[in-house]
């Protein structure tokens, strides 16, 4: 235990690891001869988590097992068990295919690119970001909305492979074993069912440009980013063993799926179609390739994405877990902000239920949670820096619904302040 001279500090306890006093931390845990603060405990847990991530259980071939990959995804992403299983198996098979290519020449194992379909805020991008943390192969994420056909303002599709090269420190051999996630893939859908006489340079044109690199070709990649340096030497990258995962919200696809096979009629004898009350994620489970064609993807592009995984709408329980359970959960973030004002922020359990219900009503998934939390805490965060001795702020369900103000608990007088709206 760290000792500091002076009569005022004789009874003050200090963390034996970081040296902070009991007044500078939330908790100080006592051992036989030492003390450790909550911040050092959290730091130790982070170190252990990192060690666990880097030591995934290996199967007989030295490959991470699908179950272990899925378990790591569970630590960071709430819900979506089916999508996690699909991704875990795909990554496991990707490793196996790479090992097989170096040992056998009899049967060539083709890759199975993946299409992730799910409502906005359901966790598609977060799943990809989590995969990037735990994989031993190079991984990169690209945004389909920035891509255009070659010769037009925007990024060429070869820039995706350039990002993969950068992720592998320009080691071409490693880059050729990597995984690419292309986000917002639904934004490059064809603008109409019928081919247009004008060029669709950011839609169908991009799909056609992606065909060869997704299937497997030797791409010429400009190491300095392409169009501004026409004299540079190109790197040759074989994309045959690069796994492509595409994700998108596909807004409007649920209507195409719901109306598939239904005949339309008019007049007095027309049959009245009942509205589909199913949630978006539930409808997505019934998706067929023909629905994607109607949405605006070209047949050749759909054919290069043989594995389709759909994500569910997040229900109230899942949204509540997202608020509190992950390492960077929203409630923990705001609690840390309030700690900087020496104030403890507490959410009642029923208040979290109301927040989750509001997010479901907004139909923005987990992304809507931050907006709701900001509106709840705005006035409190505005007033708090100018108030003295506020020890605790309590948020109840009425506060979330806008019926009352947060409850302020003061340290010295132990007074409670909270007025109804």
Curated annotation (Swiss-Prot):
This is ATP-dependent Clp protease ATP-binding subunit ClpX. Zn(2+) binds at residues 15, 18, 37, 40. Keywords: ATP-binding, Chaperone, Metal-binding, Nucleotide-binding, Zinc. ATP-dependent specificity component of the Clp protease. It directs the protease to specific substrates. Can perform chaperone functions in the absence of ClpP. The keyword Nucleotide-binding applies. The gene is clpX. It comes from the Bacteria. One of its GO terms (molecular function) is ATP-dependent protein folding chaperone. Component of the ClpX-ClpP complex. Forms a hexameric ring that, in the presence of ATP, binds to fourteen ClpP subunits assembled into a disk-like structure with a central cavity, resembling the structure of eukaryotic proteasomes. NCBIfam families: clpX, PRK05342.1. Coiled coil: none annotated. ATP binds at residues 119-126. SMART domains: AAA, ClpB_D2-small, zf-C4_ClpX. The keyword Zinc applies. Residues 3-56 form the ClpX-type ZB domain.
């Amino acid at each position: 235990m760290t000792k500091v001279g002076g009569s005022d500090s004789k009874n003050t306890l200090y963390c034996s690891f970081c040296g902070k006093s009991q007044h500078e931390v939330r908790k100080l845990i006592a051992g036989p001869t030492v003390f450790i603060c909550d911040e050092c405990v959290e730091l130790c847990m982070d170190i252990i988590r990192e060690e666990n991530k880097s030591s995934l259980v290996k199967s007989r071939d030295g490959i991470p097992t699908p179950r272990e990959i899925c378990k790591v995804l569970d630590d960071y992403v709430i819900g979506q068990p089916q999508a996690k299983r699909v991704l875990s198996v795909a990554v496991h098979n990707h490793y196996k295919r790479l090992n097989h290519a170096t040992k056998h020449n009899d049967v060539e194992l083709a890759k199975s690119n993946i299409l992730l379909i799910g409502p906005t805020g359901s966790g598609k991008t977060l799943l990809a970001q989590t995969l990037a943390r735990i994989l031993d192969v190079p991984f990169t994420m690209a945004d389909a909305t920035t891509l255009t056909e070659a010769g037009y303002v925007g990024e060429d599709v070869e820039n995706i492979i350039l990002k993969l090269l950068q992720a592998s420190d320009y080691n071409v051999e490693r880059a050729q074993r990597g995984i690419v996630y292309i986000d917002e893939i639904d934004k490059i859908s064809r603008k109409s069912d019928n081919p247009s006489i004008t060029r669709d340079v950011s839609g169908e044109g991009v799909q056609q440009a992606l065909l060869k690199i997704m299937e497997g070709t030797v791409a010429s990649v400009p190491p300095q980013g392409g169009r501004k340096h026409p004299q540079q030497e190109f790197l040759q990258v074989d994309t045959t063993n690069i796994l492509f995962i595409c994700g998108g919200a596909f807004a409007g696809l649920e209507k195409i799926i719901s109306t598939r096979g239904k005949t339309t009629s008019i007049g007095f004898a027309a049959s009245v179609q009942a509205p589909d009350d199913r949630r978006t994620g539930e409808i997505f489970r019934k998706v067929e390739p023909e629905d994607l064609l109607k949405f605006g993807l070209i047949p050749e592009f759909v054919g290069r994405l043989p594995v389709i995984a759909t994500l569910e709408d997040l229900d109230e329980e899942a949204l509540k877990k997202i608020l509190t359970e992950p390492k960077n959960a929203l409630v923990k973030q705001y609690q840390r902000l309030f700690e900087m004002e020496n104030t403890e922020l507490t959410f009642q359990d029923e208040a979290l239920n109301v927040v989750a219900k509001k997010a479901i009503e907004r139909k923005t998934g987990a992304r809507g949670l931050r907006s709701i939390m900001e509106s709840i805490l705005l006035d409190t965060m505005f007033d708090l820096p100018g108030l003295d001795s506020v020890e605790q702020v309590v948020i109840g369900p009425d506060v979330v619904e806008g019926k009352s103000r947060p409850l302020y608990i003061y340290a010295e007088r132990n007074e409670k302040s909270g007025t109804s709206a």
